[in-house]
């Protein structure tokens, strides 16, 4: 699989993405290539670490902790909050707590590093994205519709209720990508877990079962994470200046 052709194709696609972003979207021509290089370096380093880490449960736990910290920091930055972005760790934690204990207690996912780390990573990544988008769009909405919040407050409504009226739609929108992925799985898209298991085992039934597990786990974790984000924003724990 690893060949000169693969390297050439990846380089061409990364450069092409940068050119399109620069010429047509007026963005940075280096954003996509730099992101691609960073992904190569990070995945190479992670692959090397995982070979050793997944062999022991305690080292797998360290990997999971690092993944969670990075996800929380990334979500905080993406939210563009000026205060309280650290609270997004609570949203991620709630999302993971709703899924991982259930998977482990029922034996669906074996209590081993080689099984737990991939599932944890997929669910955490999706929850991070949904929570960050939810926080960012909710704060955007509070900024753009500040007058509506003030009007609701003037009528005697609570601060939480006044903000929640404005941010409900943005919170729901943050869930759309994964909902669409679940709705179109197998019809429009062949998700990564499905393809990976199919290539590894050749069993379509096993591949389908793993992908269903991942998709539904993502749905639950993201819904819980976004719900917590909504409460945190509505209660003023996560804010943006002038928001």
Predicted regions and their residues:
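C-terminal ends of transmembrane helices
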Residues: 17-30, 71-81
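Alpha-helical transmembrane segments and their membrane-interface exit regions
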Residues: 66-75, 120-128, 217-219
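Alpha-helical transmembrane segments of multipass membrane proteins
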Residues: 18-19, 47-49, 68, 72-73, ...
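Loop-to-helix transition at the N-terminal end of transmembrane alpha-helices
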Residues: 30-58, 62-65
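Membrane-embedded alpha-helices of multi-pass transport/permease systems
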Residues: 124-149, 228
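Loop-to-helix entry region at the N-terminal start of transmembrane alpha-helices
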Residues: 2-9, 60-64, 80-134
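Short cytoplasmic-facing helical segments at TM-TM junctions of multi-pass membrane proteins
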Residues: 137-170, 174
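Transmembrane alpha-helix interface motif
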Residues: 171-243
